[in-house]
Every structure is written in structure tokens, then in C-alpha cells.
């Protein structure tokens, strides 16, 4: 046959699968790669140290990033995007577009405080940020700072300038062959379930990322 068959869209889960935090999912199609959420792993020190190891994907090839809401386990690693090579837009609701820059700046400031605590030996974070025994985690940490800093205030501000808000229920094309529609998830102000419509040959496939639903 002379006609190629379009590759079926795929989903790869890099977090919040078998666990609660670190939400991060990659949607891949023939023509686009969309990352939905890029949140922090939280909890025990071993969980937090996972934040220093980026997902095994080429961020430079991403077509778009979407954020469901401004809770740190869904957005907390967005500040890493400039260091990882992503220079595109971050799509979210209009209220989340207002909140995200503030949340990321606050996170960067908190990381600086934790580094100071580590260096002067004060606070529980001196233990939390101890170098991990896992060689892969330790090597990844060296790419940033030792002890690891995920991103600076400058990184956070750069990402903040790339955030684009969209109204609920309005379709918006965010990547070649991919449209987005946001639905109110009722979780926090601006929270959304993300509906993506993918052009797949003569078909259209829809995928819904629920995000966090409801007030708890």
C-alpha cells in the first residue's frame, strides 16, 4: 500500500501513576507532543529527590504544555522548563494564568530558603536535601546546584511570561492537529479538566485529563 497509516496517539505517564503527586503526562501524535502538568513530587525525602531527575523526554521537541491548576503537585516543576530547553507556551485557564507566576516565584524563593538552611545547618530541610544515594539522582542534581535547586526566581519569571490563559469551554488550537477545551473541575479557583481533540487521519480522537476534581 502506498498510503502510510497515521500512528495512534500515545500517553506516557511520568508521575501521579501509582502515586498522588508529581502529575506529568505526555501526549504524542504524528504531528505534536503535548505535556499535561509538570508537578512536584512531595512527601518523604526520597520522593522529593525525584524532582531533580527530569522525565526522559526531549523538552525541546514539545509542541505545548498545559497546566490543569496551580497546586504545586501539578505545576511545581514548570519553572524547570527554561533549563530543560522548552521555549513554548504554557496553556491554562485565565485564573490559573494569574496564579501560576506567583506560585512559581514563591516556590523559587522557598528553594532559596531551603538551600540557606542546608548550608547553615538549620531547619529540617538540611536533612531533606541531603544528596541522594542513587547515583542517577545525584548526577542529575549536579546539573543544577549542589544541593539541588530546581529553578531560580528568574526561571520562574521567564515561565510566567509564557503562560497563556483560555476561557472555559472554548476550543483553542494549541499544537498541530490538537485542540484544547477546558472544563471547570471545581477544585480550586481556575482548576480545569483538560479535553484534547486530536486529528488522526479522517478521525478525531478526544482525551480528557480530569485533573483534581472537587473541593478536596
Listing of model-derived features with the role each one plays in the protein:
Residues 159-167, 172:
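Eukaryotic helix-linker segments that join adjacent hydrophobic helices
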Residues 1-3:
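Cysteine-centered motifs
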Residues 17-22, 29-88, 92-162, 213-216:
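Pre-active-site segment of Zn-dependent metallo-hydrolases
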Residues 7-10, 14, 26-29, 169-216:
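Catalytic core of the metallo-beta-lactamase
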Residues 10-13, 51, 56, 76, ...:
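Residue-level detector of functional hotspots within protein domains
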Residues 12, 34, 66, 91, ...:
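Hydrophobic/aromatic beta-strand patches that form the interior of the parallel beta-sheet core
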Amino acid at each position: 500500500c502506498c498510503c502510510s497509516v497515521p500512528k495512534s496517539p500515545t500517553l506516557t505517564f511520568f508521575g501521579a501513576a501509582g502515586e498522588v503527586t508529581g502529575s506529568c503526562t505526555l501526549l504524542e501524535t504524528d504531528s505534536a507532543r503535548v505535556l499535561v502538568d509538570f508537578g512536584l513530587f512531595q512527601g518523604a525525602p526520597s520522593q522529593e529527590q525525584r524532582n531533580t531527575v527530569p522525565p526522559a523526554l526531549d523538552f525541546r521537541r514539545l509542541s505545548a504544555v498545559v497546566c490543569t491548576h496551580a497546586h504545586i503537585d501539578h505545576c511545581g516543576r514548570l519553572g524547570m522548563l527554561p533549563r530543560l530547553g522548552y521555549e513554548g507556551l504554557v496553556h491554562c485557564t485565565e485564573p490559573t494564568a494569574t496564579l501560576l507566576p506567583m506560585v512559581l516565584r514563591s516556590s523559587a524563593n522557598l528553594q532559596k530558603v531551603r538551600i540557606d538552611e542546608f548550608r547553615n545547618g538549620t531547619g529540617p530541610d538540611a536533612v531533606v536535601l541531603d544528596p541522594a544515594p542513587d547515583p542517577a539522582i545525584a548526577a542529575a542534581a549536579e546539573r543544577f546546584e549542589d544541593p539541588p535547586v530546581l529553578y531560580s526566581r528568574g526561571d520562574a519569571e521567564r515561565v510566567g511570561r509564557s503562560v497563556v490563559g483560555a476561557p472555559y469551554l472554548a476550543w483553542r488550537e494549541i499544537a498541530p492537529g490538537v485542540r484544547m477545551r477546558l472544563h471547570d473541575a471545581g477544585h480550586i479557583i481556575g482548576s480545569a479538566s483538560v479535553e484534547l481533540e486530536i486529528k488522526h487521519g479522517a478521525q478525531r480522537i478526544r482525551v480528557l485529563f480530569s485533573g483534581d476534581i472537587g473541593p478536596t
